[in-house]
Structure formats: C-alpha cells, structure tokens
Amino acid sequence: MANNIIPNVSSGDLVGSTPTFPPNAVVRGDFLYLRDVDGNQIPGRTVSDGDEITVLFISNEKNIVLVQYPTSSGYRQGYVTNATSIIKYKDDYSWVNGSTPEPVYDFDKTTQIGTLDPRERAVVLYKVDGMTYVAYDTGKGKLTKSGLVHYEGSGSSTGGGSFNGVAPGEVVPGGFTYENNAEVVGDELYLRDANGNLIPGRSVSVGDKITVLDVGYTKQLALVQYPAGDVVRQGYVTNATNLIRYFNQYSWHNGSTSEEVLDENGGHLGSLNPYEAATLLYEKNGMKHVVYDTNKGPNTKSGYVKYEGAAATRVDIPYPSITNAQKIVYGISGRGRELAAYKVGNGSNSLVFVCAIHGWEDNWAADGIELTRIGNGLIEHFQNAGTNNWSLYIIPVANPDGLSEGFTNNGPGRCTIVGAVDCNRDFPLGFSPGGVPRYHSGSEPLSVSESKSLHDFIQGVKNRTSGEMCVIDLHGWEGAAIGNPEIGEYFRNQFGFGQRSGYGDNRGFMIGWAKSIGAKAALIELPGSTKSHSDVVNGRYLQKIINAVTNLIGGSGGSSSGGSSFSDVSYEATGEVINVQSFLNVREGAGLYTNSIGQLRQGNKVNIVAKNGDWYKIKYGSEYGYVNSGYIIILKNNTSVKLEDWQEDCIKFGWGPITKEKYLEYMDSTRLYKSIENDISQAIKNKSLINVINPLNFSVSEMIACTQIVFNNETTSFFRDEWYSKSNPNFIVKYKKLSNGQIIVLDRINIKKPEKLKTKIPKAAKGAFKDTIKFEFFKGIDGWFTAISGAISIGSDLSVFQSNGELKSNEDIAKALAAAVIVNGVETMFCAFLGGFIAQCIAPEFPIVAAVAGAIVSAIAAFAIGYFVDNHEKEKYLMNSFKGLIDYLF
C-alpha cells in the first residue's frame, strides 16, 4: 500500500509527536491489540480505552484498520481489528452524496475500488489533495471500507465532526446555530454520541434552553445544542419527548394535500398528511425544519418541508361573567388552555350542555364562537335563575384550541390543533380510527386531551347523579335535533326544525356514547340559514335556547321577546355611562336581544328607577328603557330610607343631623369597617385565621383588598380576578380588566370614614412595628426552622443577623427566607406557619394588619406552589413576595 499520503513505517513504529491527520475517532469500552498488515498480533503493543486515534485506512478484505495512536514517546502507527463497537468516530455520516453515483478511489486517486449510491452517506476521516477520504458501509456491515472521493458532499465536516463539524460533547464556535426552540423539563438528559453511547461528564440540565437540530427516527436520538457555562456544546440525547418541551409545539400546519418531508439535500424522508400539525424547529435554505409525530409517538422524526404552513385565524375566546356559578377546570387542551365547565344549581338531576366541540362549523371562519357566546349566555342567565332540582354543567367551548387557532372546517379548527382529531368522532362507541381530515380520529378512542377530558367529566357527573341525566351537544348549522326526541322537542318548538333519527353511535359521536352510559342525549344543529353573528342575534337564538332549557328542567322561562326573567325592583339612583367606546344601547326590555330604542354615549348621566337582574331601568326621554349595569357607575344613591332608621343610626353613631345622601354614604362605609373588623378579629380570636382567610374565598378576598387600600395607603389592589382602585378618596371602585384592555366596573364601595365611628383598626399599617417586635418576629422564624428539623438551617440565626445589623435591607431578609424555604422544600409548612405566627406576634394590638398579612402569606403559598415548577422561578417569586410582605409589616 505504498503511497505519498500515509507514512511508510512498520506496525508499532513511531510517526512523530503528532498524527498525520487530526484524530477522527476514539477507542471506548475496551483496549485493542496492535497487529501487522496481515492481522498478526504485535506483542506488547495495545491501543488503550479512551485513546483518541486517527483512522487512516479500513481494509474491507481483512477487516482491519490502520490507525495512529498516542503513546508516552509519541504517536505510533499500526493495525487493529475493525471493532466498530469500540472505535467511535467523531463524524456522524456528515458526508452526503449528490443525485448521481460517486466513484471511490484508492490512494493513487485513479484506481476505482467502489461506488457510493445517490444520497448515500459516509463518515469523513480527513481531506487531502482536494479529495475527501471517507469510511462507508458495505455488505459486511457499517464502516467496513474506506477510500477517496472527489465530491465534497453536502456536509460541512472536515473530519472528526458531526453537524457543522462539531463532535458530540465539543464546543460550538460562535454559540447557538439557531435560536433556542425547546427546554429540558423534569429531569436531566445525558449526552451521547451518534450511536447512543454515553459521553462521560456531559449532561443537559433541567431548565436548559436548547436548540434541537435533528430528531433521528431509527435511533430516537435528538441532536441538540445546549448551554455549558460560558460556551455552547453539541451532542445527542435520548429523544425523551416527556422531557423535551418545544416552544412552538404543533405551530406548523399542513394544507389540504400531502407534504413531502425531505432531508437537507432533497432526499425523501417521509410525508405529512393533509392538515397534519408539526413543530417548527428552524428555517434553512428556504425550507422549514420540523419535527412531527410517527407511529413511535409524538415528535419522533424530523425533516424539511417546503410548504410555509397554513395561517391560523386568531380568535379571542369570550368568557362568561360569573357571579353565582362554580367554575370547574376538567382538563387542559393540547395547546395548554383550560377546559372549563360552569356549574349552576345543586339538584339531584344533571344536565351537561356542551358547546363548540367543533371550533369551526361550516358557514364562516371560526363560527363556533357563536356557540361559545350562547354557552356564556346560558351561564349568565341561569346563575341568577332557578334551576329547580337540577344541576347544570355548561361548557362554553370544548375545543378552545380549534376555535382560537384553527384555520379550516375540514381539519384543525373543526378538529383539535394538537392531533387534528374530530372530538365528535373520537368517543368509544362506534369508533373508527383515521378517516379523512374533516372527521379524523386517532388510532384509538379518546386520543386527544379534549375528548378524553370531556369523556371523563361527563362520566364523573353521571356517577354523582342520583336522578335524571341529560347531555346536549350544540352545533351549527344543519337545522335539526338528533338523538333523544324528548329533548329534541324542546328545541324544535323554539326553532321549528325537524327531528333526525339515530345517535351516531356507529361513528364515535359523543351523544351515542352518553346514551350508552344511561343519559338522555341529543345533538342540536342550529338553523342552516345562519350566515353571520347578526343572524344569531336577530334570530334570538340565545333566548330560544334559554326557553328550551328552562322548559326541559321544568322552570319558568325567560321572556319570549328576549328579555330578562327577572322583575323590576325599585331602586333610585343617578349614574354615569362608562367603558363605552362607541355607544350604549337603550333597550325596550331587560335583555340583550330586545329591541334598541336609543343610544347613550360615554359620560352621559342617567336617572335609574329600578333594577332588573343585570339591567337598570332608566328614564329615557318621555319613556323608559333598560341599560346593562356593567356600563353604569352609580354617582348618587337616591333610594328612600325610613326616617326612624335614619334618626336612630345618627344618634347611635353620634353623627348628628346629616342629609339622606350623607347618611347612605356613612352607612355603606360603616358596614365595610365593621365587617372587616368583626370578621377578621373573630377569626384571630378563634385561632382559625388560616382556615378563614382563604385566597379562593371571594368575600374575604374583597375584604382583604379593601383593607389593604384603606389602611396601607395603597392606590390599587388585586385579589382573585378583580381589581380595586382608590382613585377617589371617598370610595373604592371594583372592576375587571378584559384581555382587550377594556375595563368593566363592577361596584363602588364607600370608604369615607365617619368622624365619630370608633374602630380598633389603625389608620395605617406602615410604621406600626417597633424594633423589639421585629426582633421577636425573626426569633420566631428561627425557632420554627430549628423545631421542624435539626437538619434544616438557613446558615445563620436571622434574629442575630437582624440585631447585629447584618440584614441591611428588607430585600436581604426576603432573599434569606426564600432561599431557606426552597432549599429545604418546606414552602407549604412555612407559609402556613408564617400566616399564623404573624397573627400571634401582632395581635391583639394590630389584629387587622395581622389578618391581612396572614391572608397574603396564604395567597403567596397557593400561587407559588400551584403555578411554578422550576425552583429558581419559585424562589424568585417567593423572594419578591416576602419582600413585599416585610415592607408592608415593617
């Protein structure tokens, strides 16, 4: 094998202090005996486990490899057995052939010794004289022959590298090649080479933001770049789909035809079905690299596609205004949205009313939003109406992803985004896998979260129902009642359409399955003439459905004209129109679908004469009309009062002779002050502070918010999902912020304190603590950590730190507390202790401050533990929360 490329020395001889070409492989797992050109062992010579070597030549005939390897005296050259399980190449088949066969030559560059097929891959060993020396597969196995090729290949490796010439575990020059597209969650991932062998000392940590470059279907290895201190490294990890969370999960959607998946050079890898979703990783050379689902599971193969992807029609999902309904989150959608039902009533009979199981129906884009609006209207109506002996479970949107992010009524939109499954073909009874995109289902029933969660929720309601059980599935727009004719009749009477036979129990329908578990079930298709939102409004669909449901549950329905089912209640006040961008309709009845008789503008004053549910009856010109109370703020309460009550209260509280308006204002604020003082003080007295001050208890949360504003001189406060603002010194405005930035005022609470009203509540909490109390506070915390476990320590005694002046700021204190709590995993116990200890430490001198502080701690614990998984984020949140609490107290 005489040539001018490889040194002409005997096996075992030295070739110099460095190898002829850079090392391109490593010996891993065992040592290799050195041999001569005929394969005979050379005594006393071995290549050790862990040696980085340069492979110069592979003999296909003799199954031996010519290598240069390191010794104490320099690099030696010789042959070893071609043990492919021990010789690990740094390159991972980065050389890719073009579209024509490529001749392979011997070292003389003229004698052809083989051929590489079009698109065939090879491992780059080194480059010489404008040619590339590669190792490739033959009939004898992987990497069993080598030779020179003229074609440089599509890969950019110069030998010893994999993707972009970077060997597994090595540093990526210049940092990440593409933006991070995933995060490691739940557990660390060990770094591996291209064959799946562990690389000692290398791993990708939980929380690391990574760039996934490729996902190999055969070996299920993901090639990733990850942060390692100040550098970025590259290598393979097991494709643990439960640990690799993609940022753009299923963001790419195919169109109406199949899409070919290609390798980097245009070679065929696979295909994506019409409307199938995939996860975008990055873009390169005008193509998109996506990872997609296969029979091995989600995100198990990647490749390039040329199609840009279908554009979604983004829709903001409307939500109901809740005053007397229980929200039940029964699952999470594929894209992470809540799947929610709203319970109204508490009877022994149950009705589950499902809307928008199809985000897109068939008459216009995202028309499922009309079904969701109807669902919201049902909730808002029945939460203030009688339900007889029925419990109503109303689901406004069963497929929120499809409604919000969908793009077709023949795939994702009608179907789910993740999985592209038609939930109304995914139930167990009569299930068939696959199908065309419009009716697509998974390989087995309940294959997506939306259908599985809905199935489990309905089954759970059925299990808890002792009386009658009904299920209604609302759709559009075919104008028919399907399924149970008894239920259908209530809707046929309202809309005038016909009844169809069958339950779809041979096609995976939800109502077919519901019937099989003993429920009465019907699918309602709203009229086919519906072409717009205006048709829904003008057709009074909501009121008709309210009437149908009311008749079904045996109640007294609402007005057939679309008005409220409430009656007018005398109420005199002066109000002002707010939160109106264009105009506010004045309607002839107390209902959204009654006729408009006029319009009001922002800032218009109104004279209110009565209340009717969520509506105010007002004097409008020479007649009367109704306006929604959400758009009116009360400026002056004109409600009549009894003279004897007026006089008695003025004497009782020592207010003297005052006007009726001032009396009403004083009584409102007196109720607030007394309610706060009595309720919270009683909780402290009974030692039940933690049980009573619950951040999920609306009335107490409102109390806390008001207390914070009144007694801590705050401008705004936020509790649960509502804001409280003291923009006016005499009252607090309670309001909600909608996703579009609109503010809806809910109430106005008088807070101007009557001069002679005596209360134990201090005027302000700030500055209330003396240094001695602060010292006792920290002593108590130190004692708790000591008592809970001898092993738990926060480094030093907080009380000593405080007395020595070493905790120079409240931020220092908060950092110490947060770190101690997180490191020792005692969030729940500590927050519970802290709430009670604050009450004990502060009361009885400052009972209200103690109660508010305890409530804040409970809220901190509930929020931190419920919403944060990552300890770093949790610690940061607790630190900020504790600092705010300490600022509040001291």
From Swiss-Prot:
Keywords associated with the record: Antibiotic, Antimicrobial, Bacteriocin, Plasmid
GO biological process: defense response to bacterium; killing of cells of another organism; proteolysis
InterPro entries per record: Cell_Wall_Dynamics_Protein, Peptidase_M14, SH3-like_bac-type
Disulfide bonds: none
Domain SH3b: 22-84, 179-241, 572-636
GO molecular function, one term: metallocarboxypeptidase activity
Active site (UniProt): 525
Cofactor names: Zn(2+)
UniProt region (Hydrophobic), positions on chain: 815-869
Binding, Zn(2+): 358, 361, 475
Domain (Peptidase M14) ranges: 303-549
Keyword RNA-binding: no
Induction record: By UV irradiation.
PROSITE patterns according to UniProt: PEPTIDASE_M14, SH3B
Keyword ATP-binding found: no
Function summary: May function as an ionophore.
UniProt name for this protein: Bacteriocin BCN5
Species whose genome carries this gene: Clostridium perfringens
Organism lineage string: Bacteria, Bacillati, Bacillota, Clostridia, Eubacteriales
Gene behind this protein: bcn
